[in-house]
Curated annotation (Swiss-Prot):
Belongs to the bacterial ribosomal protein bL36 family. GO terms for molecular function: structural constituent of ribosome. PROSITE patterns: RIBOSOMAL_L36 (PS00828). GO terms for biological process: translation. The gene is rpmJ. It comes from the Bacteria. This is Large ribosomal subunit protein bL36.
Amino acid sequence: MKVKNSLRSLKNRHRDCRVVRRKGRVYVINKTQRRFKARQG
């Protein structure tokens, strides 16, 4: 999982990327290509 300051570029890496909030943190998840996971921080 990548940790980035801004998720704007990461959510555009694949068409299935979704931005979700969990426990106060912002994540990018991808159900089909799991290597595109990222967390903001």
